[in-house]
């Protein structure tokens, strides 16, 4: 039996909308992986007209499921994250995409850093994304171990991603306004958050290690052709141009 790692003062926040079979499979794999290896807290917030997660939810009291009814055609990730952050009762919260897997030591190292109060925000990786293609997903699923994936990955995108997984001190993130719900669908919400946190005077650590992505089909709302992409870019540019004082005033104007 695998050794369980205790991360009890930590809550993983997983926003989702099940718009394909891939999303269902990947969410299940991610939650199974976290529960196999960690004694921790997990919240899933699901946006949809009717819950699809309920039909395959198998984790009982180990996972909290929040259903957020919505007729919006876009995925409002930032709103779901804010709902989960406010529901979390731990000092450390983790913004966690529903298709990301990390080597185990990276979770532990990031949590230890935040739990020590040395730093309040940390990305637990510093590599380009390694993609686990759908055809290779079964290799991971068999034992829920990255050791089984080995070289069966691809690298498609240059640079280190600005999102995926971010460990955060909940109280300090509150001072930064939490998530910016002006972002809708996909585009720039992760990098805006990092820029805003840094402009508020905090360091955002990048820790050594890899990041793996479970591949999936994409709807137009998961790409830069979504109708909100330009507005998202403008929202990001607004944050980039602001001073700390201007950001503080802007946060006070938010009504979400």
Identify the role of each PLM range.
Residues 71-87:
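Glycine-rich, basic loop-to-helix element that forms the pyrophosphate-binding segment
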